[in-house]
């Protein structure tokens, strides 16, 4: 699926513009409109982010998070990636499952 079936392209562009210099997942989730989406739509977004279909979003996929929204977006740096993981990985297994993702978006 495509991310634009769930999110508005204008909102995505605004959210990406805010991430140019630094990434804050909460700001991104709110600006992109993710926080208002149903669990079913969040699961769709999760499936897009889970590029290797492992059922989890791992560190390498978090690093490329923004590129799921725009191919030309930057990679997250190590500090941003680690903070993003820490925010979502409530069971501390080093990756983010779909329920953890939904909880992080709605937090």
Swiss-Prot record:
Q: What does the UniProt note on pH dependence state?
A: Stable between pH 3-11. Homodimerization increases with increasing pH.
Q: Which InterPro entries match?
A: EF-hand-dom_pair (IPR011992), EF_Hand_1_Ca_BS (IPR018247), EF_hand_dom (IPR002048), Parvalbumin (IPR008080)
EF-hand domain: residues covered: 37-72, 76-107
Top-rank taxon: Eukaryota
Activity as a function of temperature = Thermostable up to 240 min at 100 degrees Celsius. As the heating time increases, homodimers increase while monomers decrease gradually. Melting temperature (Tm) is 79.2 degrees Celsius. Reversable thermal denaturation.
Gene Ontology CC annotations of this record: cytoplasm
Q: Give residues annotated as binding Ca(2+) 2.
A: 89, 91, 93, 95, 100
Annotated Ca(2+) 1 binding sites: 50, 52, 54, 56, 58, 61
What's one Pfam family the UniProt record gives for this protein?
EF-hand_7
Report the transmembrane regions from the record.
none
Protein keywords? Allergen, Calcium, Disulfide bond, Metal-binding, Muscle protein, Repeat
This entry's Gene Ontology molecular function terms read: calcium ion binding
SUPFAM superfamilies per record: EF-hand (SSF47473)
| Expression across tissues | Expressed in muscle (at protein level).
Subunit and interaction comment: Monomer. Homodimer; disulfide-linked.
* Family to which the UniProt record says this protein belongs: Belongs to the parvalbumin family.
What exactly does this protein do? In muscle, parvalbumin is thought to be involved in relaxation after contraction. It binds two calcium ions.
**What is this protein identified as?**
Parvalbumin beta
Query: What is the organism field in this record?
Result: Mustelus griseus
């Amino acid at each position: 699926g495509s991310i634009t079936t769930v999110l508005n392209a204008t909102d995505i562009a605004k959210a990406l513009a805010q991430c140019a210099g630094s990434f804050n997942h909460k700001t991104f989730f709110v600006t992109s409109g993710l926080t208002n989406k149903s669990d079913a739509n969040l699961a769709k977004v999760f499936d897009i982010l889970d590029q290797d279909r492992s059922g989890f979003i791992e560190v390498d996929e978090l690093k490329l998070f923004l590129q799921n929204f725009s191919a030309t977006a930057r990679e997250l740096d190590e500090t941003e990636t680690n903070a993003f993981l820490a925010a979502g990985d409530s069971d501390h297994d080093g990756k983010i499952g779909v329920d953890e993702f939904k909880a992080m978006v709605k937090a």
